[in-house]
């Protein structure tokens, strides 16, 4: 048994060194808790930071954009505008569809928002059109969030109407019930219906009108209560043949009598089973299909939701006929899993590299095993805390753990190195452990709390970016805290049991060679340091130059928001001339599909044409291009997009806009390109004046590409100019005119067929095959007050005009969105500045306001707060260090190392061609915490040497630098190698991880070289300043 000197207290580590069994069991408990926590943690791409978002869709077939705006959208907007917690309200009113997107404050629970939306819809019900086929429908989903899964349902033997009916009743409803699913949309528009196509000439010859037919159909098909008979002994429920279920029954319907002979519907119309809306279509690759897009609720876990869908699919497909095929075209979780797996691999690689560095420096297997236990234990223990905080395993938390690999090993290295030094001097292992751990305990606490202080400002970042990095910061802080605990408990205990003079002195050829190499390096460093200390002002000028250089680099480096990820899915919008019909657009879409599917990187394609909740007009089509896995294609998504756009440019009459889907979705509307800029006015006339002028200037800017606008005011309109006097004389009202037009051309839903499983519509329209275009208006007939039939042309003139294809609002005012991409040789910061400069040259009137939207707006907000964030991190660290050292001066000495890290990080980013984005900024903030460790280790030992050995400040700092050179170099290389796998990552999601690694590696290299020389010089300068200040105060006191 070793006899311990009385001074060998060991500080806070003594209890754990002396009780190895208790310490071991405590560490086993941390390990088990972490393993259990890891298995319980959900997996996602990023932390769940979605805004509470609700979409309200109202369909009114046949209504123009102007009617939809005034009769549907505006009443709803007025009610929604009164809700508390509403952050932004945007709407899009197009032909037959109104879509309102409500984005609420991050602090408002989605369920509370849902209740408010339902109450507002109820309040607006009486203000909406009485013939609205269906009330407004809301869904808890962000329309700009790409679907988590896309499925295509096809059949070679069944019509699409039957396929959609089965999908809607048997598949979509079941998927909608899965927890986390926000909305299941069916694209393809093939809902079954009975279509009644009136022969205008036939009903005119019989003296009938479309209104006569509509009234007859409506009255012949009803489904209402009839009562029951309650007799003395039996009760009988009343029923009747009041419903018609098939097209054949409708053909036989008598709509009128002439000369005693019945006129049946089949005599004046073509009645057939068909689709409810014939102007909708969807395709999977080149095959017509029903496409199911599954979107998640904001905040729902994407992995567990997708897994639940996958588990249910076999059961659902078994309920369908064998000729019906269900294909999963895209699953976002495939890339998310691959990205998380790559990050996990990089984490393991970082651990292996760090352990290798430890062996290289310590040259001793027992000494290497000790931190080899400490590093994984600290990281695994973090998972237990993550579970209690409702975190997930995602790219950011795994990045935090990967970076933490270099952090957490520092503490263990510092402890082992200090204990080993005493063992090599001849101390017994137990005594050395107690003495070394006690001596280094304060340093470990200083390192830990000063590093955590750097992370505190991240917790106070505002808006969605702050929420995004909350998990990153807390995960890293927890890992650092656990590391400190392990380093003060397990590490010294293992050193006392595993290290000995024999094991440390035992050398092989490698250890002897490396020892000589390190001795030569330390000797060279000592000579260089002596020269530097003899020329302090030159060194100080270098330090000041790095500060100036860091500011200049900060100003000139290209700035961005969030790295553009390659998730293997591309969203696209196909734009054709504004007067394009559905048939024309469908043909163009097929031409484009042929071109896209020839690209070797494309795996599948879904496309949609028609007006619904996601597509505003007939002249546009939505595309989703699913790429092959990254390891099966040669190019990343940006090169694929450029290649596809070049190929599609050869298709005449269409423009294709493409953008890669991203894990982080801040936008609330589906835009054509990545970034948005809005013009908002009090009237549409103001927009029609200024939007074209601004577009012309923006399209000339080299900083922008793919500039487009959703302002489309050249849609063809047949304006029916009714002579009201003539109409009134004949007893014809404007309501009669509107009804006649709606009956003929609005695909009017006039009746409902009820079944046990679903409801189907009866659609009324004119058969216009023989009278295309404006000539069809000549066939319209109206009934006068005396029962006569009056041609529409006798009381109205038809004028062709232009009008908007859709009317968009932002917070109830007209708005247009200009979308743009950023070319490869420019940054988002360049594009934003160019737009702002262009706007100033236009001198826009006061009634027009401009604003960036989505990720561009978030970029502006993040850029504005970045400098304050870094300042806050520095101030927080100064306060913590000042408290720990009870000094105003020493924290400044420690913080003087920071400019060198900034210069290294910014230079590395510029050399690598990376932007200074949010991820890179987080790396710079972490560097603030890392590089000051070098100064802390030097200053701690210098102060101890001055205090305990009576050394002069110069001798003390010189000895401290030589004494701590090896652990400083070791810890810096460990942190560098912890970040290296992130810098070199090439797999799925590498774009997200690489800026963090580049910035940290560059900052660590430059700071390591410079701070070894600048820190001791600044330490001595501040020491002289302190002495001078004290002497001045002393002189003043003597004179007083």
UniProtKB/Swiss-Prot annotation:
The reply to whether Cell membrane figures as a keyword in the UniProt entry is yes
Main location as per UniProt? membrane
What family, per the record? Belongs to the resistance-nodulation-cell division (RND) (TC 2.A.6) family. MdtB subfamily.
Q: Which domain of life is it from?
A: Bacteria
- InterPro entries xref list: AcrB_DN_DC_subdom (IPR027463), Acrflvin-R (IPR001036), Multidrug-R_MdtB (IPR022831)
Query: What membrane topology is given?
Result: Multi-pass membrane protein
* Species this protein is from: Escherichia coli O8 (strain IAI1)
Q: How does this protein assemble?
A: Part of a tripartite efflux system composed of MdtA, MdtB and MdtC. MdtB forms a heteromultimer with MdtC.
What would you give as a GO molecular function for this chain, any one?
xenobiotic transmembrane transporter activity
What does the entry say induces or represses the expression of this protein? The mdtABC operon is transcriptionally activated by BaeR.
Summarizing the function annotation, the protein's role is: The MdtABC tripartite complex confers resistance against novobiocin and deoxycholate.
Q: Which UniProt keywords apply?
A: Cell inner membrane, Cell membrane, Membrane, Transmembrane, Transmembrane helix, Transport
Fetch the HAMAP family from UniProt.
MdtB (MF_01423)
Give the residue spans that cross the bilayer.
Answer: 16-36, 347-367, 369-389, 396-416, 440-460, 472-492, 537-557, 863-883, 888-908, 911-931, 968-988, 998-1018
One GO cellular component term of this record is: plasma membrane
List locations, semicolon-separated. Answer: Cell inner membrane
Q: What is this protein called?
A: Multidrug resistance protein MdtB
């Amino acid at each position: 048994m070793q006899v311990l000197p009385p001074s060998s207290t060991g500080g806070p580590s003594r209890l754990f060194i002396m009780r190895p069994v208790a310490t071991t069991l405590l560490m086993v408990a941390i390990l088990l808790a972490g393993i259990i926590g890891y298995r319980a943690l959900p997996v996602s791409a990023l932390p769940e930071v979605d805004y509470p978002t609700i979409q309200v869709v109202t369909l009114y077939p046949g209504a123009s954009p102007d009617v939809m705006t005034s009769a549907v959208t505006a009443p709803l907007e007025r009610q929604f505008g009164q809700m508390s917690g509403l952050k932004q309200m945007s709407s899009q009113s197009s032909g037959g569809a109104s879509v309102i997107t409500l984005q609420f404050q991050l602090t408002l629970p989605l369920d509370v928002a849902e209740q408010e939306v339902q109450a507002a819809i109820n309040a607006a019900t009486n203000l909406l059109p009485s013939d609205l086929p269906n009330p407004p429908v809301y869904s808890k989903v962000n329309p700009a969030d790409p679907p988590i899964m896309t499925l295509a349902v096809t059949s070679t033997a069944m019509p699409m109407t039957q396929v959609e009916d089965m999908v809607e009743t048997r598949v979509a409803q079941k998927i909608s019930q899965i927890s986390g699913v926000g909305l299941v949309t069916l694209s393809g528009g093939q809902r079954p219906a009975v279509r009644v196509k009136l022969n205008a000439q036939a009903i005119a010859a019989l003296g009938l009108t479309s209104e006569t037919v509509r009234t007859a159909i409506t009255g012949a098909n009803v489904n209402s209560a009839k009562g029951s008979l309650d007799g003395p002994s039996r009760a009988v429920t009343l029923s009747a043949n009041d419903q018609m279920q098939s097209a054949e029954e409708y053909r036989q319907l008598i709509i009128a009598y002439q000369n005693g002979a019945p006129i049946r519907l089949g005599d004046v119309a073509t009645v057939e089973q068909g689709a409810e809306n014939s102007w909708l279509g969807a395709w999977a690759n080149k095959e017509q299909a029903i496409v199911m897009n599954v979107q998640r609720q904001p905040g729902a876990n994407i992995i567990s939701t997708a897994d639940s869908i996958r588990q249910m699919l076999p059961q659902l497909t078994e309920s369908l006929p064998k000729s019906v095929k269900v294909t999963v075209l895209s699953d976002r979780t495939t890339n998310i899993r691959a990205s998380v797996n790559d990050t996990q691999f990089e984490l393991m690689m970082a651990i292996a590299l760090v352990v290798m560095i430890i062996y290289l420096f310590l040259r001793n297997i027992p000494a290497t095993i000790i931190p080899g236990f400490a590093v994984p234990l600290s990281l695994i223990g973090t998972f237990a805390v993550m579970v209690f905080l409702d975190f997930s395993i995602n790219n950011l938390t795994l990045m935090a753990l990967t970076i933490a690999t270099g952090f957490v090993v520092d503490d263990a290295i510092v402890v082992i190195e200090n204990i080993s030094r005493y063992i090599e001097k001849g101390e017994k292992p137990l005594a050395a452990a107690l003495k070394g751990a006690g001596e280094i305990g304060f340093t470990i606490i200083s390192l830990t709390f000063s590093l955590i202080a750097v992370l505190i400002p991240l917790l106070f970042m505002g808006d969605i970016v702050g929420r995004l990095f909350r998990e990153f910061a807390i995960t890293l802080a927890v890992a650092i805290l656990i590391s400190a605990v392990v380093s003060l408990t397990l590490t010294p205990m293992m050193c006392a049991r595993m290290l000995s003079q024999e094991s440390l002195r035992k050398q092989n050829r490698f250890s002897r060679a490396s020892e000589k190499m390190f001795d030569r390096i330390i000797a060279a460093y000592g000579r260089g340091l002596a020269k530097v200390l003899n020329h302090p002002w030159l060194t100080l000028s270098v330090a000041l130059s790095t500060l100036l250089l860091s500011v200049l680099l900060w100003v000139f480096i290209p700035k961005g928001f969030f790295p553009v990820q390659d998730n293997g899915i591309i969203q696209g919008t196909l734009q054709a001339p504004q007067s394009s019909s559905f048939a024309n657009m469908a043909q163009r879409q097929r031409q484009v599909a042929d071109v896209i599917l020839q690209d070797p990187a494309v795996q599948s394609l879904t496309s949609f044409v028609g007006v619904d909740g996601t597509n505003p007009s007939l002249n546009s089509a939505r595309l989703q291009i699913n790429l092959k896995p990254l390891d099966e294609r040669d190019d990343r998504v940006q090169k694929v997009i450029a290649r596809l756009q070049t190929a599609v440019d050869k298709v005449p009459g269409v423009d294709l806009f493409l953008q890669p889907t991203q894990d982080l979705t801040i936008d609330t509307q589906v835009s054509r390109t990545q970034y948005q800029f809005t013009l908002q006015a009090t009237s549409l006339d103001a927009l029609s004046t200024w939007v074209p002028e601004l577009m012309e200037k923006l399209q000339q800017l080299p900083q922008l590409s793919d500039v487009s606008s959703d302002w489309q005011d050249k849609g063809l309109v047949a304006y029916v100019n009714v002579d009201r006097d003539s109409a009134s004389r004949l007893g014809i009202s404007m309501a009669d005119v509107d009804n006649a037009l709606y009956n003929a051309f609005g695909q009017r839903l006039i009746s409902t067929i009820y079944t046990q499983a679903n409801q189907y519509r009866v659609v009324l329209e004119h058969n216009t095959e023989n009278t295309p275009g404006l000539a069809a208006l000549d066939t319209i007939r109206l009934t006068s007050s005396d029962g006569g039939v009056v041609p529409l042309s006798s009381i109205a003139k038809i004028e062709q005009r232009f009008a908007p294809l859709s009317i968009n609002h932002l917070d109830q005012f007209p708005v247009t969105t200009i979308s743009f991409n950023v070319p490869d040789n420019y940054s988002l910061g360049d594009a934003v500045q160019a737009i702002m400069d262009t706007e100033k040259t236009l001198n826009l009137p006061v009634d027009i306001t401009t604003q960036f939207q989505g990720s561009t707006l978030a970029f502006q907000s993040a850029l504005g707060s970045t400098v304050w964030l870094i300042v806050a991190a520095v101030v927080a660290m100064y306060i913590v260090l000042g408290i720990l050292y009870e000094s105003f001066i020493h924290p400044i000495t420690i913080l003087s190392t920071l400019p060198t890290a900034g210069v290294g990080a910014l230079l590395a980013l510029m050399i690598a061609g990376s932007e200074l984005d949010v991820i890179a900024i987080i790396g710079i903030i972490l560097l603030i915490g890392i590089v000051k460790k070098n100064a802390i280790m030097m200053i701690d030992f210098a102060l101890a040497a001055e205090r305990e050995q009576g050394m002069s400040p110069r001798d003390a700092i010189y000895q401290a630098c030589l004494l701590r050179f090896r652990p400083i170099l070791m810890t810096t290389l460990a942190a560098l190698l912890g970040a290296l796998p992130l810098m070199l990552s090439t797999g799925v999601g590498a774009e997200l991880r690489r800026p963090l690694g580049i910035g940290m590696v560059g900052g660590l290299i430059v700071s390591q070289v410079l701070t070894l020389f600048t820190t001791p010089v600044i330490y001595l300068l501040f020491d002289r300043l302190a002495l001078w200040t004290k002497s001045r105060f002393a002189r003043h006191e003597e004179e007083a």
